[in-house]
Amino acid sequence: MSKRRIAPLTFLRRLLLRILAALAVFWGGGIALFSVVPVPFSAVMAERQISAWLGGEFGYVAHSDWVSMADISPWMGLAVITAEDQKFPEHWGFDVPAIEKALAHNERNESRIRGASTLSQQTAKNLFLWDGRSWVRKGLEAGLTLGIETVWSKKRILTVYLNIAEFGDGIFGVEAAAQRYFHKPASRLSVSEAALLAAVLPNPLRYKANAPSGYVRSRQAWIMRQMRQLGGESFMTRNQLN
């Protein structure tokens, strides 16, 4: 008796479901593991490293030094919250009003796309996913964001974010950035230094902390004003983030 042939669409559907199931197990395990274990590298770091090698840049090294929140200046945590996600302590991974505003803006200005990703979303993307703006990646990002918001504390999310965020070419994490740009550990970053590092986060490969443009300087000044308005270090203590 000949075996029944499986229709191509059925085969592809089953294959896709198996791949998604495997990814769910992999990512779920990663979320559980990295809730307590330092993150050795991120998907973005791996992507940058592989791209460099494929381009013949064999001297490129995606560098990161993991540090705990106790070894990071409270100004640094406050600076990235101020710059990227001021509602970070309040939401469950998504800033819905900001998303609605971004969608309305993008409909009117297709040439200048505005994002509304929270720190939680950026952490999920940087840690587990590839660069890009596809709806598939956005969907996966949403699921991963819910995962880390459910399993991790806000302090843990911020700690991981600060250790894997890209601050320049091959520079990942606030410790590597502090050593490269200011020749000091992240624990000793001042208000202005923290604000400068946060100011380049929209595009750290375009904006340079070691050669800040007028835009970066104005953004740095805005971040410092906003940090004061949020309450300075007391904001971090009040929200159990340091």
From Swiss-Prot:
Single Gene Ontology MF annotation: pentosyltransferase activity
Q: Which GO terms describe its cellular component?
A: peptidoglycan-based cell wall; plasma membrane
**Pathway involvement of the protein, from the record:** Cell wall biogenesis; peptidoglycan biosynthesis
Keyword annotations from UniProtKB, A to Z: Cell inner membrane, Cell membrane, Cell shape, Cell wall biogenesis/degradation, Glycosyltransferase, Membrane, Peptidoglycan synthesis, Transferase, Transmembrane, Transmembrane helix
Query: Which membrane topology describes this protein?
Result: Single-pass membrane protein
List the Pfam families hit by this protein, alphabetically.
Answer: Transgly (PF00912)
User: What does the UniProt record say this protein does?
Assistant: Peptidoglycan polymerase that catalyzes glycan chain elongation from lipid-linked precursors.
| Protein name (database record) | Biosynthetic peptidoglycan transglycosylase
What's the name of its gene? mtgA
